[in-house]
Amino acid sequence: MRDVTVTGLDKAFGAHPVLAGLDLEVPAGSLTAILGPSGSGKTTLLRLLAGFERADAGTIGIGGVVVDGPGVHLPPERRRIGYVPQEGGLFPHLTVAGNVGFGLPVRWPGARRPGARQRRAGQVEALLETVGLAGFGRRYPHQLSGGQQQRVALARALAIEPAVVLLDEPFASLDAHLRASVRADVQEIFRRAGTTAVLVTHDQDEALSVADRVAALRDGGIAQCAPPEDLYSRPADPGLASFIGDANLVDGVVSGSTVKTLFGCLPLDPAATIPGSAGQVTVLIRPEQIDIVPNENGLTAQVTSFRYYGHDAVLYVQPEDEAGGAGSQPVVVRVAGGTHRAAGPHLPAGTTVTLLARGPVFAWPAD
């Protein structure tokens, strides 16, 4: 298991800069997700780590060894990188065992010794057992589900005993019902193997649910790299808060350890850095921090849209001002499936609800 260190990385294609001064630390044995929208440079970063592209400036180190930098560029085969492309990249004419063992004759020094074939077969079967596909060695890729194909691709990447495994949006092609289970499988496989891994994705749910650390890519650099719960609850700025998930960004005034908002006074997250512990701020209230409360004092609002997903429901509401008219900006509320019935069996547009927000809340000094 090796760490990955990226310092001051630049990459442009012609006159189009993609990465600019990017810094990133991937701890040994961790699963780090690179999260960014399409076109943000996620795959370019992965290709630079793999050695498929050369950096224009900066350095990349793996396990303390510089593999890309001024005067240095180790080719992919010398970096001990396992690579899992988006579609898996399995050879259709090879069996599952053939795909998994494809790199072993090159990697394994004893490949030509007596008994090597049997040892190789045993190693392949052990890898298949690791990814939950014991007994699948004689099947062909077309006989597998999408999730099984991705696990074969992962076993092939692990076969070379890599320093780092790189995964390029590995779940994007899977059906929605498979995606969550395969994510959990991959997370457990890496946990057991103790392998350092870097995964790129545009899916916030995927990054937050799978990774030990999430690095948000923006404007060619890393806007913030943190554990998922910190990135979600304590993002670096309001723009990042909106990118990571639904966010209610409201005005507030800080006084000591509380902040006054349209929801009343709420406790302030101690991690929020407010100069002087007072003044105008922008407050982050996630939709799940807001409850619908019957017959209680709270913020009165009218439902403008209601979306039911089974496990939860999302309401878009317009707060009322003190005179009963439309007040401040719209608010997003997320409640567990069924709990919205506290306000009635249905919540069509125009329904009046009472809202209560729960702290602590995070905030930034207002611009």
Features from the language model and the residues they span:
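Conserved ABC transporter NBD signature motif
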Residues: 58-69
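Conserved coupling/switch loops of ABC nucleotide-binding domains, chiefly the family-specific signature
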Residues: 56-59, 219
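Conserved structural motif at the start of ABC-family nucleotide-binding domains
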Residues: 4, 19-21
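The feature captures the beta-strand-to-loop junction immediately N-terminal to the Walker
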Residues: 35-37
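Non-catalytic connector elements of ABC transporters
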Residues: 258-367
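Helix-to-loop junction immediately C-terminal to a conserved catalytic motif
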Residues: 50
